[in-house]
Amino acid sequence: MAKELKFSEDARSAMLKGVDQLADTVKSTLGPKGRNVVLEQSYGSPTITNDGVTIAKAIELDDHFENMGAKLVSEVASKTNDIAGDGTTTATVLTQSIVNEGMKNVTAGANPVGIRRGIEEATKTAVDSLHAMAHEVKTQEDIAQIASVSSASEETGKLIAEAMEKVGHDGVITIEESRGVDTSLDVVEGMQFDRGYLSQYMVTDNDKMEADLDNPYILITDKKISNIQDILPLLQSIVEQGKPLLIIADDISGEALPTLVLNKMRGTFNVVAVKAPGFGDRRKEQLQDIAILTGGTVITDDLGLELKDTTIDQLGQANKVTVTKDNTTIVEGAGSKDAISERVEFIRNQIGETTSDFDKEKLQERLAKLAGGVAVVRVGAATETELKERKYRIEDALNATRAAVEEGFVAGGGTALINVIKDVAALKETGDVQTGINIVKRALEEPVRQIAENAGLEGSVIVEKMKEQKPGVGFNAATDEWVDMIKAGIVDPTKVTRSALQNAASVSALLLTTEAVVAEKPEENAPAAPAAPNPGMGGMM
């Protein structure tokens, strides 16, 4: 395939057109009075959204050079979304401003490498200032405010705050589609894993088809149980105690399973058997998690332990266990809080060290199960289009809230970015480096300017007036009032704001230092070949 090349000014201006087309589409959604964008789908109804990264990913331009510019901005939005989960529109607005101002200066003869140094220096100063002014998330009200601003819904804010309160900051909160029009919250207390009972004859509630065990002992092993004699001494001890038993094993087969079922049906003792969750090394780690949660010991060859020698002291315990055909839920395990805390910290360290996204996801699931359980937000809406839009908003709100828990929050509505301008302005360099600093100074005004313009006001007037206010006082575009943003509950997670700025500065600096662009040469449309006569149809009229 032949390639087409563009150099210097031609290359940069072509990419700039793509940057502007994507950014102009995305930035119309910024702020409380931002508009929606309708996205065509290959099938089904169109999607209506104001989610920056969703819009950015949907844009594909005909011109290869312009499309590369658009894709670089889309990359800024995606990376910000990956790191912080929100702030994608802000990142896009910042990128457009830095690129446009930078291009003007490079065209006028400035050295792009010097400009890049200035951009990097100013960005570092701005990020340090954001961290210095950040407030820690302390109350449920703080969480509700952050989620409300991100989703533009007080109801959603309260729902996410309630979910976080129930499962903890490290708990898993999943978002699913509801069959009704209402949005609700369900919480699975304790640890749940996706393994159900091995025989339906083990159920205790025939209506719900589930087995409930109150204050059970829990045998945890990575061995296969095929001979009932291996666990007979243990079963006799449990019968004497009069307590139910949950068996978590690699498998239960041979004579062991029917013997357990028969004794259960006779009323000798109450027992439920399930297979161990996970596979391979992950199975061993998950069994260890369950053991620590319940205060038991994993019966494994790795520790030199045999099933026939197992004692009641080596079993785990819990307040309640519920087993369905698909899942096992352990509520209020008897493990020590110190041991659980140590295990949580160990898994957190593993998350920080792993480079695999898949491993990280599995570790986070394990962390959540140990640290607080699982909350399910079931999103309801009247139509499929509204449902998609509401899901996007709730996902953004959830991500923003988690980001705020990590790094705190700052005044929202672009106010924090205006407040850090004075620290950036204090930087004194010379030549093109100073030009780069000035470009970032100008870009820091852009989110406020755009929020005001989307609200039908003159952006530059609002920006200048905000610079005269005390730090933290900003413009509430929803009510057209000047307020203390934090007291008014208009806040942004520090992680979201700083990620947007860092990613925008990084990609913009790369764009400005681009000297050549290589793209696929468009294929010329070949003339259509004349239709060949069909020999099998000769003579037919």
UniProtKB/Swiss-Prot annotation:
- The reply to whether Cytoplasm figures as a keyword in the UniProt entry is yes
EC no.? 5.6.1.7
What keyword terms does UniProt attach to this protein? ATP-binding, Chaperone, Cytoplasm, Isomerase, Nucleotide-binding
Per its database record, what is this protein's job?
A: Together with its co-chaperonin GroES, plays an essential role in assisting protein folding. The GroEL-GroES system forms a nano-cage that allows encapsulation of the non-native substrate proteins and provides a physical environment optimized to promote and accelerate protein folding.
Subunit description:
Forms a cylinder of 14 subunits composed of two heptameric rings stacked back-to-back. Interacts with the co-chaperonin GroES.
Intracellular or extracellular location(s): Cytoplasm
- Cite the residue spans of the region called Disordered: 521-541
- What is the designated name of this protein? Chaperonin GroEL
Entries under Gene3D superfamilies matching the protein: GroEL, GroEL-like equatorial domain, TCP-1-like chaperonin intermediate domain
**Protein's organism:** Lactiplantibacillus plantarum (strain ATCC BAA-793 / NCIMB 8826 / WCFS1)
One GO cellular component assignment for this chain's record is: cytoplasm
| Top-level taxonomic group | Bacteria
Gene that codes for this? groEL
Q: Answer whether the UniProt record assigns the keyword Chaperone to this protein.
A: yes
Q: Which GO terms describe its biological process?
A: protein refolding
User: Which reaction is the catalytic activity of this chain?
Assistant: ATP + H2O + a folded polypeptide = ADP + phosphate + an unfolded polypeptide
